[in-house]
């Protein structure tokens, strides 16, 4: 009888220990492997690569976005084109395009060759972003390059760390960005972000830098309720387009810093 109890005790202990080991191992896999991390790439947009990219839709963002994202508003055939068009939905007056990577990216150089829309009330962007909808438990971290269609001779840089923004910086380009393709970039390090225009460093931030891996994104949208920032969008101007020639990501350890 004593021997029987002893065997039962050993069996229960073995079962519990096995569960503990399996659980511990599974948690390690989740932390180490589940978040998909991207590597260096160059995207020419000759065709749509659904292994690298996802088109947004069908859903809406916050209240200042007067559009619903639709996948058909993103096309790629040598150039990637985002489009705003009229379409009254239950929530918004227009449909628009947004593209994002499937993988996450960390410190490095993020570059784009693009031509923004020159229409008041619109925002053309290239940025990185993550939040709780992108990965469970992630803070709202974001790094922005944005063009306001009301004045495409200027570019806006911004970033958010755990939802805290207020880091806007406007730079006068000396040319109209909507008239030709130019290269815009930011170098993201653990302790700084430096933005570039055609290879020239034009702004650096060093305070409260975001740390979380993020997805690379591009979108074009009409604003509403933020007229002081974007200007007023006139729907008679639709369709509206922004164009992207190429995108490149280079991990920090893989490139020489711009001089």
UniProtKB/Swiss-Prot annotation:
Alphabetized UniProt keyword annotations: Glycosidase, Hydrolase, Signal
Family matches, as PANTHER family: XYLOGLUCAN ENDOTRANSGLUCOSYLASE/HYDROLASE PROTEIN 8-RELATED
Signal peptide limits: 1-31
Gene name per UniProt: bglBB
Name of the protein this chain belongs to: Beta-glucanase
EC number: 3.2.1.73
Function (record text): Hydrolyzes B-glucans containing mixed beta-1,3 and beta-1,4 linkages.
Domain GH16: 35-255
Organism: Brevibacillus brevis (Bacillus brevis)
Active site: residue positions: 142, 146
Temperature dependence: Optimum temperature is 65-70 degrees Celsius. Thermostable.
């Amino acid at each position: 009888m004593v021997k029987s109890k002893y065997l039962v005790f050993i069996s229960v202990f073995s079962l519990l220990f096995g569960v503990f080991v399996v659980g511990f191992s599974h948690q390690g896999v989740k932390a180490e492997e589940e978040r998909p991390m991207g590597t260096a790439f160059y995207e020419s947009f000759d065709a749509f690569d659904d292994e690298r990219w996802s088109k947004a839709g069908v859903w809406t963002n916050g209240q200042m976005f007067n559009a619903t994202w639709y996948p058909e508003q993103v096309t790629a055939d040598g150039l990637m084109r985002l489009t705003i068009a009229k379409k009254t939905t239950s929530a918004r007056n227009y449909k628009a395009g947004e593209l994002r990577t499937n993988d996450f990216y960390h410190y490095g150089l993020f570059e784009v060759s693009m031509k923004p829309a020159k229409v008041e009330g619109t925002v053309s962007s290239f940025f990185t972003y993550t939040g709780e909808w992108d990965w469970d438990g992630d803070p709202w971290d974001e790094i922005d390059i944005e063009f306001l269609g009301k004045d495409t001779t200027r570019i806006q840089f911004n970033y958010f760390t755990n939802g805290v923004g207020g880091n806007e910086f406007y730079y006068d380009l000396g040319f109209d960005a909507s008239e030709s393709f130019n290269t815009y970039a930011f170098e993201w390090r653990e302790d700084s972000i430096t933005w570039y225009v055609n290879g020239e460093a034009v702004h650096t931030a060093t305070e409260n830098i975001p740390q979380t891996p993020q997805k690379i994104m591009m979108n074009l949208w009409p604003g509403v309720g933020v007229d002081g920032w974007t200007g007023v969008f006139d729907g008679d101007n639709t369709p509206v387009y922004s164009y992207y020639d190429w995108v490149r990501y280079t991990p920090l350890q893989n490139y020489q810093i711009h001089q």
